[in-house]
Regions:
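Acidic, surface-exposed loops and disordered segments
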Residues: 1-167
Length: 167
């Protein structure tokens, strides 16, 4: 719970957090994903397995949703945040497709970094994983329809005492 909370509290540019984290709990889905992760055992063996997914594009609607949440959280009128909202929308529209992907991926990695730091602080082993077939992950997790792309994976748990990689 603490690791998840750390990712939810992660800083991000403009405060948008253009990503989501999917906790993959279903054993059958993990078995389906394992070959797409080049057979890495952490997919099925780790206590927890997460997919960090970044938005493929940040829309005006995304900014409006964020602005409404910010207004509610701070007790501010949405109209008072209109200037900021317009500024962010303008910045998002300036980005090319590749710039948008790179920017949202960087924001996602900030959250991953917080998850890794929190896991280390709690004594939980964490394995970030970039070795996977992203397009096939996107399909298996139904991400394209949601406007997300699998960015990086994270396996969490405690190592077996006899793990030969433990030092």
């Amino acid at each position: 719970a603490q690791i998840k909370e750390a990712t939810q509290l992660s800083a991000s540019s403009y405060g948008l957090q253009p990503y989501k984290i999917i906790e993959i709990k279903d054993a059958q889905l993990k078995e389906q994903l394992k070959p797409l992760t080049w057979g890495q055992s952490q997919v099925t063996d780790a206590s927890e397995f997460w997919a960090f997914c970044n938005k493929d594009v940040v829309t005006d609607e995304d900014v409006d949703t964020f602005t409404a949440l910010r207004a509610k959280t701070t007790g501010t009128e949405v109209s008072a945040l209109g200037g900021y909202s317009d500024f962010v929308k303008g910045k998002m529209k300036e980005k090319s497709e590749s710039e948008m992907f790179n920017w949202t991926a960087k924001q996602t990695y900030i959250a991953l970094g917080n998850a890794l730091a929190t896991a280390a602080e709690l004594g939980v082993d964490a394995t970030p994983m970039e070795g996977f077939e992203a397009d096939q992950y996107n399909e298996a997790l139904g991400l394209k329809e949601q406007g997300y792309i699998t960015c990086v994976l994270l396996a969490l748990g405690k190592r077996h005492e006899e793990d030969s990689y433990q030092h």
